[in-house]
Amino acid sequence: MAEDSSIAATPAPAEGVISKTYHEVTQPFIDLWHAPRALWGVNLAYTIEGLSYFGILTYLAIHFSDFVFKGVEHSDVWSHEMVMVLTAGIAIAMVVLGFVPDKWGVRRALILAFVFLLVGRIIMSAAPTVLGLAPSGIWSPLHLLTMAGILLVVIGYGMYQPAAYAAVRKFTNPKTASMAYAMLYALMNLGSSLAMLAFLLRDDQFLGLGITGTFWVYTGLTLVSLLSTIFILSRKTVAEAIDRAKAETEAMGAAAQEAAAKSGEQKSKDDVATGPRKVPVTAWIILGAILVTAYFRLPEPGNYAGSLIVLLIPVVISLLPARMRNSTIQWIALHPLADPRFFFFIFALMPVQTLFTYNWLVLPQYISRAFAGGWIGEYYEVASNANPILIFILVPVITALTYKAKVYNMMVIGTLVMGASAFILAFGPTPITLLGYIVCMTVGEAMWSARFLQYATEIAPPERAGLYQGVAQLPWFLTKFLVPLLYSGQMMEKYCPADGPKNTESMWLIFGLIAVITPTALWLSRGWMMKGFKVKHEG
């Protein structure tokens, strides 16, 4: 550890920490109060949608396993894969539909997104209630109609998230943009934390709506989001906000910034023209991983067809005309994933990022089953949704306490704290261990998540920082896809079934062993990762 003697953060003066923390916690609300009407239109709907999305997500695995797939063998496995369709599907949809706000305008994109979200949630809610569809196995009318609703939600959210951020970008100038983005993040956490109170709607001791009835409440909130967007974000309001932001940006020297951006683009083009023409080893690693996944996870005979397609990719590239082949290889060689340090960094984070997916795939079912018969199990929404409000509070506190710490060191310590949290639940399901897990995981997340994109930016060539930030999100998408596909449903079925003996200690021990791969890998590779870090793109 001699090489990392700077891991411990230099403590800030007490008054400075308190002042900085108070500022970070209260500033989003101050900014919200003074925000222009256009940003109010975005922020209000974003807060409500945070509650609606995460509220439904909390119940979704339980809704499928205990209701839609009632009596079906391996219902936990099937339910987790259905949740995967939503979460991974949204990640894909955002890539595919990200052009909508640019082409049609942010107001139209937001309204259209909420229409899709509303119709999708109406279908999900109406299938077992208004239409009276009963559980009758896999691919039953109830299952198919619920999935149809989810697919509409996927399309809607695929447009909504890019549109919300595009709106903030268009309604702000370079000076106020970071404040507006921070406000969105804070309000999303605030909105999603309100799902803690959903038991007041669901539980028989209160309103007794059940899960399907609570879905209707979230559907109604989606209608509120749609109407608020239509009336607050009027055409006149949007036009005035965009014109004002443009004028402010021009006054701040937008022309100089555009010239710098063009210079960066030209440099990037020059780099491409003279770039390497050798396929990097990282590309072969990715191809091999896709091949293994296709062969072992696709059902026969699809696994053979999928594997063959993967194997044909390099063959097809090699048979392309020389100019096209060279351009393709150059694109691969200059892609951020061709950078071995960046490749290692983002994929090394995947094990600890699996803990994020457990928040909706595992925790609601685990708490309701392992703590059955008590207050915690009955009102599982409280513990399942405690993370967002804790993140809202802890991120500015920990940022203030560790602002002098090195970014990479914070990544190592933060992922270690977060990964180790799973071992707490390996001691058994008790109120103390559950509280310890939630707090420890959230503290760890607050330590490293804020530094993640910062490190991804610093490791990137200056003119390609945005591209590196975008690609850095890839492992997060992969965990949404791979965790339910590979093991989360099987683990619940084996160690925490709805009925029968449970062994949740072993389940969380395995989860912990997976998660701590990240800090172990980051620490063991620290010398290589930091070697030439500050000068790797100079010269």
PLM regions: where:
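Short amphipathic helix-loop junctions that connect adjacent transmembrane helices
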Residues: 58-80, 204, 361-381
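Transmembrane alpha-helices of Major Facilitator/SLC transporters
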Residues: 90-92, 309-321, 376-403, 414
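Helix-to-loop junctions at the C-terminal end of transmembrane segments
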Residues: 93-106, 203, 393-407
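C-terminal ends and interior cores of transmembrane alpha-helices
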Residues: 115-141, 416-429
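Intracellular juxtamembrane helix-capping segments at the cytosolic ends
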Residues: 159-173, 367, 446-461
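Glycine-rich segments within core transmembrane alpha-helices of 12-TM secondary carriers
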Residues: 178-203, 219-225, 471-487
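Symmetry-related core transmembrane helices of the 12-TM Major Facilitator Superfamily/SLC fold
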Residues: 212-231, 282-287, 306-314, 502-527
